[in-house]
């Protein structure tokens, strides 16, 4: 039997294949201090504490098209060997309460391709359904991963 709290949590996984090698993709993705390079919803990013490694906290201001203006995010895990990054949203003026994402990067079966898998869990805000919350978060994550793919592939063309 689910508790009241469990009924108000949702999550999803978004997968993106990128036509670029893992080291290139990871070098862009792992930059906790500079998400603006591929996240188009980010207007500015400033480290509030830390040096960009595990435990660092960043303040991200977002573009005016979103129903928020800023987010406080903590880097919970950054594993350069396993290519895993875990980020938690710990504050802000948005509805993504208790949001935590885990992004894992793999070498694809096809040569020179990379697979990025981002999964998340988040509280469902009062007045919203799981479907609405998942659709919103999936849209943001999907846009970010497509942008990461586009940037990585463009950088490949330049090499």
Swiss-Prot record:
Primary localization class, coarse: cytoplasm
Site positions per UniProt: Involved in interactions with PP2Cs: 67, 129
Short sequence motif Latch loop: positions: 94-96
Sorted UniProt keywords: Abscisic acid signaling pathway, Cell membrane, Cytoplasm, Membrane, Nucleus, Protein phosphatase inhibitor, Receptor
Family classification: Belongs to the PYR/PYL/RCAR abscisic acid intracellular receptor family.
Function: Receptor for abscisic acid (ABA) required for ABA-mediated responses such as stomatal closure and germination inhibition. Inhibits the activity of group-A protein phosphatases type 2C (PP2Cs) when activated by ABA.
Protein's UniProt name: Abscisic acid receptor PYL12
Upper lineage: Eukaryota, Viridiplantae, Streptophyta, Embryophyta, Tracheophyta
């Amino acid at each position: 039997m689910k508790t009241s709290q469990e009924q108000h949590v949702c999550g999803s996984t978004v997968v993106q294949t990128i036509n670029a090698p893992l080291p290139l993709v990871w070098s862009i993705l792992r930059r906790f201090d500079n998400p603006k390079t591929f996240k188009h919803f980010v207007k500015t990013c400033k480290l509030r504490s830390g040096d960009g490694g595990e435990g660092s906290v960043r303040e991200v201001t977002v573009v005016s098209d979103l129903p928020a203006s800023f987010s406080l995010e903590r880097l919970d895990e950054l594993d350069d060997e396993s290519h895993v990054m875990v980020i938690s949203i710990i504050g802000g003026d948005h509805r993504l309460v208790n949001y935590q994402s885990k992004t894992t990067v793999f070498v694809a079966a096809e040569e020179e391709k990379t697979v990025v898998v981002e999964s998340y869990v988040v509280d469902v805000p009062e007045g919203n359904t799981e479907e609405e919350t998942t659709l919103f978060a999936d849209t943001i994550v999907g846009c970010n991963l497509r942008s990461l793919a586009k940037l990585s592939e463009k950088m490949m063309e330049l090499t």
